[in-house]
Amino acid sequence: MPKLIPVADALSQPFWDAVNQRRLLLQHCAACDRLQYPPQQACQVCNSANGLAWKEVDGRGHIATCIVIEDGRLNRRMPDQPYNLAMVTLDADPRVNFYSNLPGTPPYQAPVGAAVEVTFEEVAPNQLIHEWRVAG
C-alpha cells in the first residue's frame, strides 16, 4: 500500500527525527502532565506553551476501534481497498490516539481491544514512518 511521505516543518521535525531513529517522541506538557500528538504550539488542554518538551514514550497501545475502507475517495489508495483504518490509543496516555492501517492484519480481522506496538516502515530513502502492528 503506498504511503505518504511526511514533510516535516519546524514544529514536527523532532518527531520525525525520532521516527527515523525508530523512536516514538511526543510532546509533554509539564504544566498539566499530558502527552499530545500531533505536535502543536501549545498544550491542547491547558494552552501552556512554555511547559512543552519532547518525551520518548513506549510504543505500546491498543485498538480502540476499527473500520474498513471499502469505497474511499483517495485515488492513491483505491487499489488497496478494502483496508483497515484503526484508531490506536496509546497505553502511556489514553488521551493520545494514532490512526493506522494495521499492516499484516487482513481487512475485517482487526481485533478491537488487542494490544499493538509501534513499528517503523521506510517510505523513501532515509525516511521512516510510524505504523502500528498487532502485538504477538
Name each region found by the language model.
Residues R23-L26, Q40:
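Residues immediately within or flanking Cys/His clusters that coordinate Zn2+
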Residues Y37, G51-A53:
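Short functional micro-motifs and their immediate structural scaffolds
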Residues Q41-C46, W54-H62:
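Short cysteine/histidine-rich zinc-coordinating motifs and their immediately flanking basic loops
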Residues I63-G104:
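Glycine-rich active-site loops that engage anionic ligands at enzyme catalytic sites
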Residues D93, F98-G136:
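Well-ordered alpha/beta subsegment
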